[in-house]
Amino acid sequence: MRFRFTWRRESDSAAVSAHETGALTSRSESTRALVLALEAFEREPTNADALREAVEQCNRLRDFGQAHDLLLTATEIQPWLVATLVADTYLAAGDFEHELAARREASEANPGRGDLKFKLIRARIRAGQLDEARQEITRLELAHPAAAAWMLRIDLLNAEQRRGDALLAAIDAFEEAPDEVRRYRLLLRQALTCLRKDGDPMAARKAHEILDELGEDRLGDPLSVILAIRVAVAVGREETVRALIDLLPSDTEQKEVLRTRAWLAHRDGDLGQARKIWRHLGNHSPMPSQRVCGAEELERRDGNLLPPAGDEIRLYTVVRNELWRLQWFVSYYRKLGVDRFFFVDNDSSDGSLAWLLEQPDVHVFHAGGSYAEAASGTVWLNQLVREHSPSGWQLYVDVDEALVFADIENHGLRGLTEYMERKGHDLAAGQMVDMFSMEAHQPSDDRFEDDFVSRYPFFSHEFERTQSVVCPYFFTVGGIRQLAGFGENNTKTPLARGGREIQYLSSSHMVTPGVVSDVGVALLHYKLVGDFLADFRRDVAENHRVSHCTRRYEAYIEFFETWGGDLSQIYPASVDRYSSSRSLLDHGLVTPLPEDFRTHAE
């Protein structure tokens, strides 16, 4: 079936409304922009531009239901365009499977349009259909030589975890046409990707080269300036960041620019200004984890007395079918000094809920909703922390994580919190350290694993860090899972002071601003334990995680299946055996305790 289509604006009134909403969005007035866009489409329901603007505003606010309703009513708009906007909405929601179906529908309706084919191939890459994408890239190059297939080949290399090759391809593409802005932007993005996900020395050298050669021709493009700022942050060139950000209008409110201004305020010691900027971002351009938690989302199940927070150390976490870990987990943190536990149980069916309800120091909240829609449970935990930790200390760890810092065996958590309180520190940060065994282990007959630390004693000590504009201000990659090539951020901020406006933005990988302690911590990470391959397969099959997490688990399965789950076959040279916190200290994975920490403790 053939569809007629045009990108021409159909009236001046729609053009004015689109201009107004664009200006408002640049000031982060997203709600008002949405109202204007909806009014414009209501006036002209046959106007494709008005529909597009309204859907884009809905997606910016993550109001996907309203976007869907709008598209259902757009019966007088070209079907291929509606399909494209449906795909854009699925993409904004992170639903790559349905995005792909909608892109296919739009492209099949207009087989002669190279731009729609381009978007379809990108959707295939996002959905993991890499072989199909590779074949279609070749066909696209033949049918549409000007379609910039080199961009798709770089996307494909990244999806195959071949980021170094993608950087080389980006360099080649840039050198072919150095005056082309999109090639320059892509080179900046790829250098940043390699820096963050791999700590790649070649990417670092290229980043410095790019920054050293910035000229007037590059500085006139705001997006290139913003990308250059991100690269400069990653390689620690603060003065370059300051020089570049001064080139942008002072009232620029693009998200990355605001985050950078908050980072610079932190660097200048102005925590109040950093927090003010992040409050503004949270009010106008919130991350999914910052949405309001509905009253119906959490239902308290325990009957234990819940006193005021006082100076308690309170632990918060989410569980789903983790019975075999719970006894060890709760025991470990009780010994460290946790006073009270807050568990969100996300529909466990293995007895986890019953076991938790038997514990006198545990409070249990049931969440029957989607873990993914709650931003990996972060929405729930932010709500509980707001309600139950207005003072004292909050510890956010997963049930496969064991907190460690230098000499923790002698000081416990209370020794750390007392030091942090005396110093005015809000946060303790560090990284996950993947632990594993050289032989398979299964839980004992009573269904509990009682000692992860001794059963899974090995770890890889190779890690790389780059700077970040989001607290705790660094991005960490490394550990044995890095061999799978996914480049996961291992940074964690497990300990925070209550009542200090700390919000979790991406689990505890990123948080809102606070004073980060000079005591660096680590989390022993027991993910590669038990029959972890079966756990990963079940996790993917249940599909309760956000899309990028599901893809990461798929990458783990593909990599570790190569070795049959036998980690002794991998054994990188950087492996050591954990015996105490000293094992991490020797490799720089935790920091030495400051002298006045010891003096105070004594």
Regions found by a protein language model. Give the residues of each.
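Start-of-helix register in tetratricopeptide repeats
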Residues: 15, 49, 81-84, 115, ...
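Short coil turns that delineate tetratricopeptide repeat
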Residues: 45, 77-79, 111, 144-145, ...
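N-proximal low-complexity "stem/linker" segments adjacent to membrane-targeting elements
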Residues: 279, 283-327
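Active-site-proximal specificity loops/subdomain of glycosyltransferases
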Residues: 353-396, 404-409
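Register position in tetratricopeptide repeats
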Residues: 26, 60, 92, 126, ...
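Catalytic-site signature of metal-activated, phosphate-bearing donor transferases
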Residues: 377, 405-602
